[in-house]
Amino acid sequence: MAEKALEAVGCGLGPGAVAMAVALEDGAEPPVLTTHLKKVENHITEAQRFSHLPKRSAVDIEFVELSYSVREGPCWRKRGYKTLLKCLSGKFCRRELIGIMGPSGAGKSTFMNILAGYRESGMKGQILVNGRPRDLRTFRKMSCYIMQDDMLLPHLTVLEAMMVSANLKLSEKQEVKKELVTEILTALGLMSCSHTRTALLSGGQRKRLAIALELVNNPPVMFFDEPTSGLDSASCFQVVSLMKSLAHGGRTVICTIHQPSAKLFEMFDKLYILSQGQCIFKGVVTNLIPYLKGLGLHCPTYHNPADFIIEVASGEYGDLNPMLFRAVQNGLCTMAEKKSSPEKNEVPAHCPTCPPELDPIESHTFATSTLTQFCILFRRTFLSILRDTVLTHLRFMSHVLIGVLIGLLYLHIGDDASKVFNNTGFLFFSMLFLMFAALMPTVLTCELICLAKMAVFMREHLNYWYSLKAYYLAKTMADVPFQVVCPVVYCSIVYWMTGQPAETSRFLLFSALSIATALVAQSLGLLIGAASTSLQVATFVGPVTAIPVLLFSGFFVSFKTIPTYLQWSSYLSYVRYGFEGLILTIYGMERGHLTCLEDHCPFRDPQIILHELDVEEAKLYMDFLVLGIFFLALRLLAYLVLRYRVKSER
């Protein structure tokens, strides 16, 4: 015995291993080994944690003969339609965690998008909510969709993001909202990182935050698209446990999941398995293996049932899908479930046929007014811009550095009659720089081009956080202060360094025209970004649209020398009105003669300069008026394009 102990010690084993070796040598029972590891009870799955949420009526969803088709190819080529979903029927009840499974391309996400109301055109069949035909607007107010990619605004903290959600979704007092947010964060294990920016969260924390944002108003129906995608096993278990607790709290929770582990698979209450757009199984999880066995498909021992059904659907055991389709259509799934659970032949108590009355919140479009939504979104967007230090600092420093460079290049030429054309070149370049400085950043950071921001907007808007007009106004107006400050900084540098007239009125007009031109360019950037389908398209279209705008600005070619059939193009150039206004500001308004340091100065009289540049009949107020019209028209057009894009997503 001593030799065995010494041998165990010699092998580097610890005291516990030595004791076990000795006990085994004596033929005794091995001692129970205790370690420092202890399994901690996961309280995040307790439904009681969510009892504080606002009370909402439970919802059951039923779908009958549901089909979905899309047009193949472009609309101008009539190639027919492709059917993605075929004759799907079933019922998803409250207090159940339903998993939609299937191989890649089976139609899982399409199916859930239709159930959530994100897809309408091309759908056939009927969807019932609590036994009544679904009213899409009402249904979207009582449901939420948590997408696969947890796109969050990176510059907000967890607490700030939650308060934005609470302020938009609830009409209670601020103290009640704060208490509710604190309780949700505590229940989901996010309180410790409440002051951490969302960009620094882990994958599991981001997923839980995405759920927390939608839990604020306690939606009775929750859709999850691949909630475990990209997470480790521990985070996957936490997320699925959380979904199960939400379901057992009275909600209808539906999620797509690709290939869960056996541990996660057993946590689902019911399954709806798709293959090639058709259902191959629907029912409780425990019925899957007996059901397949009855069809002659035996799952190997110790094999994950989720893996087995995916292998069957993928054709690894032959083309068995037609047989599975017929079995479901003939009602074998329903009969198998009744056979295994005779007590379930009657309708469960938690899946009533009489629809309950909807909550008062469902009778309103949004929980808050458009003005309140605008104020909340404006503050959030403005805060995000301020915290985006890279972009904000680059914008500010570029105006300062370019301003100093231009000031040094055109130093003290503003009152020199022999350098009039150099001065007009300075005025035109100022318009050129301010145009591109406002146009391109807007194009490249537009919501519909930046996928992250687009996903955030689509999730929040389609989950009925706010209206499209409130979001658009807040988004566009939040950037206006920066489009005012940057041109003013640039003008304050170049105006005095280049020696322009030392009059306050002229400087203010110079700055106002610069700001107006920058705002119009920003509006054009919004339109280009909203209309472009990709970043590459927007990057190409932005500079291309600037070419005719600059060409017909009046600097390269005067209006009189433009061919008659092209003169109309000059009226569409907003740079023309900005440049024309600057010429009138610097050389108009009854300015006195310029300083002449040479023997002959043909442009000493400012009126001659105005005549030469073909602006002597122009009116300064008209330039401001036309720039204002451009600003409003482009903003309105960008809004209409955004609205069209949002509708086309459905």
Swiss-Prot record:
ATP binds at residues 102-109. This is ATP-binding cassette subfamily G member 4. GO terms for molecular function: ABC-type sterol transporter activity; ATP binding; ATP hydrolysis activity; identical protein binding; protein heterodimerization activity; protein homodimerization activity. It is found in: Cell membrane; Cytoplasmic vesicle membrane; Endosome membrane. Expressed specifically in the brain and the eye. Expressed in both neonatal and adult oligodendrocytes. Residues 61-301 form the ABC transporter domain. Its EC number is 7.6.2.-. The gene is Abcg4. Its main location: membrane. Residues 415-423, 498-507, 558-621 are extracellular. SMART domains: AAA. CDD domains: ABCG_EPDR. Half-transporter that form a functional transporter via homo- or heterodimerization. Homodimer. Heterodimers with ABCG1. It catalyses: cholesterol(in) + ATP + H2O = cholesterol(out) + ADP + phosphate + H(+); desmosterol(in) + ATP + H2O = desmosterol(out) + ADP + phosphate + H(+). Keywords: ATP-binding, Cell membrane, Cytoplasmic vesicle, Endosome, Membrane, Nucleotide-binding, Translocase, Transmembrane, Transmembrane helix, Transport. GO terms for cellular component: cytoplasmic vesicle; endosome; endosome membrane; plasma membrane. One of its GO terms (biological process) is cellular response to leukemia inhibitory factor. PROSITE patterns: ABC_TRANSPORTER_1 (PS00211), ABC_TRANSPORTER_2 (PS50893). It is a multi-pass membrane protein. Belongs to the ABC transporter superfamily. ABCG family. Eye pigment precursor importer (TC 3.A.1.204) subfamily. The lineage of its organism: Eukaryota, Metazoa, Chordata, Craniata, Vertebrata. ATP-dependent transporter of the ATP-binding cassette (ABC) family that may be involved in the cellular efflux of sterols, in particular cholesterol and desmosterol (a cholesterol precursor), to high-density lipoprotein (HDL). May play an important role in the removal of amyloid-beta peptides from brain,in a process that can be antagonized by desmosterol. However it is unclear whether ABCG4 can directly transport amyloid-beta peptides or whether peptide export may be facilitated due to changes in the membrane lipid environment. Induces apoptosis in various cells. InterPro entries: AAA+_ATPase (IPR003593), ABC2_TM (IPR013525), ABC_transporter-like_ATP-bd (IPR003439), ABC_transporter-like_CS (IPR017871), ABCG_dom (IPR043926), ABCG_transporters (IPR050352), P-loop_NTPase (IPR027417). It comes from Rattus norvegicus (Rat). It is an enzyme of class 7 (translocase). Whether ABCG4 is an LXR target gene, is still under debate. Studies performed in monocytes, and in one astrocyte cell line indicated that ABCG4 expression could be up-regulated by oxysterols and other LXR ligands. However, subsequent observations in a number of different cell types (primary mouse cells, oligodendrocytes and neuron-like cell lines) have not confirmed this observation. The chain crosses the membrane at residues 394-414, 424-444, 477-497, 508-528, 537-557, 622-642. Residues 1-393, 445-476, 529-536, 643-650 are cytoplasmic.
